[in-house]
Regions:
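Charged (often Lys/Glu-rich) extended helix/loop segments that serve as interaction or gating elements
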Residues: 1-171
Length: 171
């Protein structure tokens, strides 16, 4: 007790500070479109609203990196999701939604990764149910270390199939 005030019990929940590095999401760029004379969009093979809901709900920003083509020339693009919703995009900065990504050449694949997303994005988006605009749930892979310190991967869940979604809907 100090100055007549009992010492308080303080309880905390550190959330993303303790598990932030545990999550990553990888997307492929499935299309690129020129919206107008200034906006170019790279469209991912999923939805930010369903797989990274904090980017939409609270404008959370994550570590974002191009996975391949690092030696290519870069360009300013916007990243958009597959849904019909105008809010399905990655809000990179407060006043600029654009990010810099390698220029995509003809017949070239491009991948982008979001890292340090913690353990909450999957639980917020839901697992195994029906997502916004019927976007299927992604494949889930666990990366771990064995007793020798070597990395290994194991499949936790396959990408959600249209048949499983139709079954949930009663078809």
């Amino acid at each position: 007790m100090n100055n007549g005030v009992p010492e308080p019990n303080i309880f905390t929940e550190f959330g993303s500070y303790t598990v932030g590095e545990s999550g990553a999401m990888l997307y492929s760029i499935v299309n690129q479109k020129q919206q107008n004379d200034r906006e170019k969009w790279n469209m991912i093979d999923s939805s930010f609203m369903t797989t990274l809901p904090d980017t939409w709900g609270i404008n959370q920003r994550f570590v974002m990196l191009a996975i391949n083509n690092w030696d290519s020339e870069y360009e300013r693009v916007n990243l958009g999701g597959l849904t019909c919703d105008s809010e399905d995009f990655y809000n990179a900065e407060a006043h600029s939604n654009a990010v810099f990504m390698p220029k995509i050449k003809q017949n070239e694949e491009q991948y982008v990764g979001f890292f340090h997303m913690g353990a909450y994005q999957e639980s917020l988006g839901g697992y195994g149910g029906i997502q916004h605009c019927l976007i299927p749930g992604p494949k889930l892979v666990v990366i771990d270390l064995d007793e020798n310190g070597d990395y290994f991967t194991k499949l936790f869940a396959k990408e959600q199939s249209y048949k499983s979604m139709l079954k949930i809907l009663g078809y």
